[in-house]
């Protein structure tokens, strides 16, 4: 990522005072109020810096980008596998650790809160395996060509779920597929 790319996609990054930064450790308890504690869980695999947050009281895990993208149409999980940190084994280990929790729902950045966390975690693992296999079979294509092929494959998958063309277009518009290709290829290069 370049500074220009980050600014275009997420705005200007401004410095903050060092004393405002608190180190987070795996398993740390964050007291929300006198009756509620959220547990910080180090959750690498998608990115080395990633944490998920578990609210034992409600059985909710806040996973950010760890699980991928989940749209309202069924349980089709679109992985989020960016460079340089995507690592399948580490991500699966993270997901297996999270599966051991008593979960009632999962909240993800893209998109929403879902009441079938174990099913979605399973679907995420299956989707990641499918994406790796698909992308691994495109070694001679440029990043752009592979990205275009991935989009064609995804559109076919969405259509098989009877999702309308406008919605598919919106879903595809949310993906940076060249970045996904780069993340998977970077991972496969070191296997």
Label the model's feature ranges.
Residues 1-42, 48-118:
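Metallo-beta-lactamase
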Residues 2-16, 66-80, 132:
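Active-site-proximal loop/helix segment associated with metal-binding centers of metalloenzymes
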Residues 24, 44-47, 175-178:
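A short catalytic or substrate-binding loop motif that flags glycine-/basic-rich loops and adjacent residues
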Residues 59, 127-138:
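Solvent-exposed, amphipathic alpha-helical segments
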Residues 83-90, 127, 176-179:
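Soluble or luminal CAZymes and related metallo-dependent hydrolases
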Residues 117-126:
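Histidine/acidic-residue-rich catalytic or RNA/ligand-binding cores of hydrolases
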Residues 134-191:
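C-terminal regulatory/interaction regions
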